[in-house]
Each structure stands twice: as structure tokens, then as C-alpha cells.
Amino acid sequence: MSTSYCRTGEKKLYFGIYERIPFAYNGRIPNDSRTTETIYRKNMEKEIIREIDVQNVMTKSSLPVGGFSVNPYVGCPHACKYCYASFMKRFTGHTEPWGTFLDVKHWKPIDNPHKYDGQRIVIGSVTDGYHPYEEDFCRTRKLLEELKGTNAEIMICTKSDLVLRDLDLLKGFQKVTVSWSVNTLDEQFRCDMDRAVSIERRLKAMKQIYNAGIRTVCFLSLIHI
């Protein structure tokens, strides 16, 4: 019996009322009716969410780890004040403050996924593939489903425990690494720095992933003030 993890055929998220209007992406208004601008209100903050079509979600990586980089989203609602990825605004044309916008990528099915056998695929180099909106849009899960059955090496960078949802898929890959970043153990300070899940939830998720036999990494990005 199959299990459905994500909503399909429904664009309304569980935590807000929104309106949808056409928007100009890279200076033009796409013809695809799926490409829309959505304004969500959550915790008294306004976040602008767009659904966009991209030709290819895989990008040859220039990172030291090599392989390919995959970012199922542009932007990140975790809104970390120290986030290095905010430089991406220079290339995407966003004028909104970092953490207040999110582009949800829709891509064509990956052609011949076995061409990535033996390749390292880093998920979340300039976004977090498991931010709260992933619970409904499921773009990261879709990517893992498309790569299922390959010998690709999967490396996930996140601050979220939502990755536990995809444990069934992750255990199907021969080589998987899940890396969490932690900047402090002071929860009050953490709340001021980012909108990700609590440090306690991250540590509990690390333990569950580790106990499932998956290589687990904790990246300590300490903040000095």
C-alpha cells in the first residue's frame, strides 16, 4: 500500500490565506498558468512565494565537494541573519529582504537519472530543502523519488527535522550524508538568529538519522558577538 506524504492538486497551504496574481520573472510574465505569485501571511509576517518552471534542477557544482548542486527552491524562509546565501539576490533579481521570498521550482522529469550514478549530489547549498513550505510543495522529496534506484551519493544540508519524513527514501541510497548546522545551544539567542526548528529538535533528528544507519554530520557555525 502506498503512502501519500504530500498534497497534490491543491495549492492552499495549511497555515494561511493567500491571493494569487501573475508576476514578472526575470523581466517577463510567463505564459504558464502555474507560475504565480502567492502572498502568505504567517506569524504576522508577509512572505512572497512564487512557483516557477526551470529547465533543469541539476547544476554542476563548483564547491570543493564536487559533483552536482541541487536547490529545489530559491530563497529560504529560515531567514538566518548570518546566511551566506543571501548573495543569490544579485543573480535572481529579488529586491525583498532575505527570508521573505521563496521561489518554488518545478522541473521536467530527470532524463536518465542513472547518469548520476557515482556522482555526489548536494541538496541545499543555497537554500534549505526542508524548510516548512517543503511539507506541502514536496520538491525535495520529488527529487529523491526521481533519483531512487540510482547509485548517486546524496548529501543533504539542513536545519530542519522534516528530513525524517523522507527516511524511507534515504535508506534506499547506498551513500547518504545528512548535515545539520548548529550556531548555538542558547535557544533564546537561536530564535533571534533564525526561524528554523529548535536546537533540541535538530539534535533529536540527528540521533534518529544516525540510528537509521545514515552518516550524520553536525556543522558547528558558531556566532561570536
Language model features: what each stretch is:
Residues H224-I225:
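Conserved small/polar residues in nucleotide/adenosyl-binding loops
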Residues Y40-T177, L185-F189, I199, L203-K204, ...:
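Conserved Radical SAM active-site core
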Residues A212-L220:
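Short beta-strand/loop segments at the ligand-binding rim of alpha/beta enzyme cores
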Residues Y14, I21, Y25-R28, Y40:
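Short, positively charged and aromatic/hydrophobic N-terminal segments
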